[in-house]
Swiss-Prot record:
The active site is at K115. Pfam families: BRCT, DNA_ligase_aden, DNA_ligase_OB, DNA_ligase_ZBD, HHH_2, HHH_5, Nlig-Ia. Its EC number is 6.5.1.2. The keyword Metal-binding applies. It comes from Yersinia pseudotuberculosis serotype O:1b (strain IP 31758). GO terms for biological process: DNA repair; DNA replication. NAD(+) binds at D32, A33, E34, Y35, D36, S81, L82, E113, R136, E173, K290, K314. This is DNA ligase. Gene3D superfamilies: 5' to 3' exonuclease, C-terminal subdomain, 6.20.10.30, BRCT domain, DNA ligase/mRNA capping enzyme, Helix hairpin bin, Nucleic acid-binding proteins. The keyword Zinc applies. It catalyses: NAD(+) + (deoxyribonucleotide)n-3'-hydroxyl + 5'-phospho-(deoxyribonucleotide)m = (deoxyribonucleotide)n+m + AMP + beta-nicotinamide D-nucleotide. Zn(2+) binds at C408, C411, C426, C432.
């Protein structure tokens, strides 16, 4: 018995520590999955030994106490958390408990929503006006974050309509879309500031700033999902109708909500959301399942820390703990040196992960990482796995320091780091085999010259056998030479030659993008092509002329000039011009186009649901718009889809007009 008491006490101590790190300091040290595992272990032990349950056990409360830096707020209606299920068997057990308690065998209707991975907040409206916003805190006492929440443009300061209750407390999640998170971290790296491990931490850190002006600059947004206090008014008697009422009041509600009757429909919804998860544009960690009928919710009631009528059906963990075995350094297309951690294989989000990016030397220093450390690895959607933290309490005595190389690990050339840049680069250029390989892979990629069948392994063999040194050499290949490659028969070789022949006919924009000029992406390449129309015009441009193009500032202009003036690049382009051609761009006379988009610089952001992004770009361009990839003072209009992030925030900061996709479709039809 003593060993069980000791085990329970150890779990409670550890859980309290991690609750404080997560809920109060916003500095979690372990993945959610590890916390959930420990909590479940403690619950199981307490269930087996109920006499050992204490009032202060982590199983008997929601979270941790708030900091003293903010005014404390007592929740009139406690903000409880949800119990979790992690597989279909556990979900079916929840479904059975609900049916048993209601004493019914009839299929029940559940409202299924996304489980957002952000920070839970309470919004109190009095006579329709936002008077207070608070964090969940420990569920009973939170922190007053009204000044910060008022800076989030998704949250209305006054509710719409006439049927607003005298007092209503709306609950929801503040979160940061992935695009905004990535830009926030990129800016922080450039300035040597704090880099956040994930969007949830970024949202929490942004909301808990003592200076609301800092919060106002962060790309936060909000979805509501429930109500706490209600006084002087009525709500519908089903949860989904409540969500529709919130929407009518002007509160943002996720579109991915569905009524499901019976467990089969619930599980099908869960599987569909798991499949769609990577394309949402923001982080979720599961699906929330609620009995839709509010009368039935009242009958089911609550346990100590959670409602009986709801559960969170969580996805496989996106973060796991493993150990760093070694660190290697890879060389990219532009010479960027990227440290990569070789890991003890671990399953993350359903995939075995054995490698993870460490980004650069600054990131290694920020993490305080050493070889042999136990680390937290994160994999979200299609994002390359990355190390987001070190578990210092598990550091062994024999860890080794990571030494960043001074010479390229592939070609031996010096590595340099330009002042103000986080990335170190090999100076070998196309002398470096690694850079040659990556430049060629980019040149033949789908959005560049789109050489069908020319995969990475073929490029690697072509370089290793010294058949190809630069993009122009690709068009000198013969079927006979290609049959000398591994797994390349005569038919495959002929198909590849045919694909190369087809790739000779392209567009000026694709050609510029294929060259791989630093920081010239698809949008910038398209803008350069539209502005200069010919390669000769582009070659003749000076810095100031280049800077007049949308998306092109001082840095990009210098990259373009340096690339086009480099002797080796000039020779390669001359050879390519002999074989690659594109039609003369049609001159679009903006004055002759009767369209609200004519002559306007337009930026698309967020997820579009009616048109694909490429379709939207094509239709806007056809009506005389210049579609840019970034927001600046030159931007005339921003079209914001779902989960728009930092670009929307910047547009609002600069006072640029913003419309949604529906308005864009309407204007396209004019």
């Amino acid at each position: 018995m003593e060993s069980i008491i000791q085990q329970i006490n150890q779990l409670r101590t550890s859980l309290r520590h991690h609750e404080h790190q997560y809920h109060v300091l916003d500095a979690p040290e372990i993945p959610d999955a590890e916390y959930d595992r420990m909590m479940q272990q403690l619950r199981d032990l307490e269930a087996q030994h109920p006499e050992l349950v204490t009032n202060d056990s982590p199983t008997q409360r929601v979270g941790a106490a708030p900091l003293d830096a903010f005014e404390q707020v007592e929740h009139e209606v406690p903000m409880l958390s949800l119990d979790n299920v992690f597989d279909e068997e556990s979900y079916l057990a929840f479904d059975k408990r609900v049916h048993d308690r209601l004493k019914t065998a009839e299929p029940l209707t559940f409202c299924c929503e996304l489980k957002l991975d952000g920070l839970a907040v309470s919004l109190l409206y009095e006579n329709g006006e936002l008077v207070r916003a608070a964090t969940r805190g420990d569920g009973t006492t939170g922190e007053n974050i009204t000044a910060n929440v008022r800076t989030i443009r998704a949250i209305p300061l006054r509710l719409h309509g006439d049927n607003v209750p005298r007092r209503v407390e709306v609950r929801g999640e503040v979160f940061m879309p992935q695009a905004g998170f990535e830009q926030l971290n990129e800016e922080a790296r450039r300035k040597g500031g704090k880099v956040f491990a994930n969007p949830r931490n970024a949202a929490a850190g942004s909301l808990r700033q003592l200076d609301p002006r800092i919060t106002a600059k962060r790309p936060l947004t909000f979805f509501c999902y429930g109500v706490g206090l209600l006084d002087g008014g009525e709500l519908p008697r089903s949860h989904i109708q409540c969500l529709m009422q919130f929407k009518a009041w002007g509160l943002p509600v996720s579109e991915r909500v569905k009524l499901c009757t019976g467990s089969d429909q619930v599980i099908a919804f869960y599987r569909q959301i798991e499949q769609d998860r990577a394309g949402l544009g923001f982080d979720i960690d599961g699906v929330v399942i609620k009995v839709d009928d509010l009368v039935l919710q009242e009958q089911l009631g609550f346990v100590a820390r959670a409602p009986r009528w709801a559960t969170a059906f969580k996805f496989p963990a996106q973060e796991q703990i493993t150990q760093v075995r070694e660190v290697e350094f890879q060389v990219g297309r532009t010479g960027a040196i990227t440290p990569v951690a070789r890991l003890e294989p671990v399953q993350v989000a359903g995939v075995i992960v054995s490698n993870a990016t460490l980004h650069n030397a600054d990131e290694i220093e920020r993490l305080g990482l050493r070889i042999g450390d136990t680390v937290i690895v994160r994999r979200a959607g299609d994002v390359i796995p990355q190390v987001v933290g070190v578990v210092m309490e598990q550091r062994p005595d024999d860890t080794k320091e990571i030494t960043f190389p001074s010479q390229c690990p592939v070609c031996g050339s010096d590595i340099e780091r330009v002042e103000g840049e986080a990335v170190a680069r090999c100076t070998g250029g196309l002398f470096c085999a690694a850079q040659r390989k990556e430049a060629l892979k980019h040149f033949v990629s789908r959005r560049a010259l789109d050489v069908d069948g020319m995969g990475d392994k073929i490029i690697e063999q072509l370089v290793e056998k010294q058949y190809v040194e630069n993009p122009a050499d690709l068009f000198q290949l013969t079927a006979g030479k290609l049959t000398g490659l591994d797994r390349m028969g005569p038919k495959s070789a002929q198909n590849l030659i045919a694909a190369l022949e087809k790739a000779k006919q392209t567009t000026f924009a694709r050609f510029l993008y294929a060259l791989g000029i630093r920081e010239v992406g698809e949008a910038t390449a398209a803008n350069l092509a539209a502005h200069f129309r010919t390669l000769d015009n582009l070659r003749a441009a000076d810095i100031e002329t280049l800077k007049s193009v949308p998306d092109v500032g001082e840095v990009v202009a210098k990259h373009v000039m340096n690339f086009l003036s480099e002797e080796h690049n000039q020779k390669v382009i001359e050879e390519l011009e002999k074989v690659v051609s594109w039609p003369e761009p049609q001159q679009i006379v903006v004055e002759e186009i009767d369209s609200p988009f004519a002559g306007k610089t337009v930026v698309l952001t967020g997820s579009l649901t009616i048109l694909s992004r490429d379709e939207a770009k094509d239709r806007l361009t056809a009506l005389g718009a210049k579609v840019s990839g970034s927001v600046s003072k030159k931007t005339h209009l921003v079209i914001a889809g779902e989960a728009a992030g930092s670009k929307l925030a910047k547009a609002q900061e600069l006072g640029i007009k913003v419309i949604d996709e529906a308005e864009m479709i309407r204007l396209l039809g004019e």
